[in-house]
Amino acid sequence: MIYGLLLHLGRNMWDPPANHLRFDEAVWREITEKMGRVGANMAVIDIGEGLVYPSHPELAVEGSWTPEKMRAELKRLRSLGVEPIPKLNFSACHDQWLKDYSRMLSTDEYYRVVADLIKDVAEIFDRPRFFHLGWDEEKEKTQRKTPNK
């Protein structure tokens, strides 16, 4: 059975986006430690602008976590018995964290960036069992074309 929680590292989903990470690390630690104590076994982490992506560092803001810091935090979560699951919200109504790319929906460049980010996060999270991509608000007609590959 999955007993988990959605945690937000990044918050730039809507306007106006901030140029810094709006995140309280002490609260994060308190919540995740309590998750381990009460037997929660999964944390879905909405990353957004909270990570310096190796392929697209231009998406970072002041205070974004480095890949090394993220890996260390993932190791700590796993030691608490909490499986970290990444979430990259690509929904067209929650994508301000993508900066200029959020205005390039359905273009080849957009799909290249999305593929790069998914690859970065899959590697940093050590090939997670699940990967949340957002899009739960989207309909099949929202995006006019799909990637060629």
State where each predicted segment sits.
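Aromatic-lined carbohydrate-binding surfaces of glycoside hydrolases
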Residues: 6-149
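Extreme N-terminal starter segment of soluble prokaryotic enzymes
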Residues: 1-3
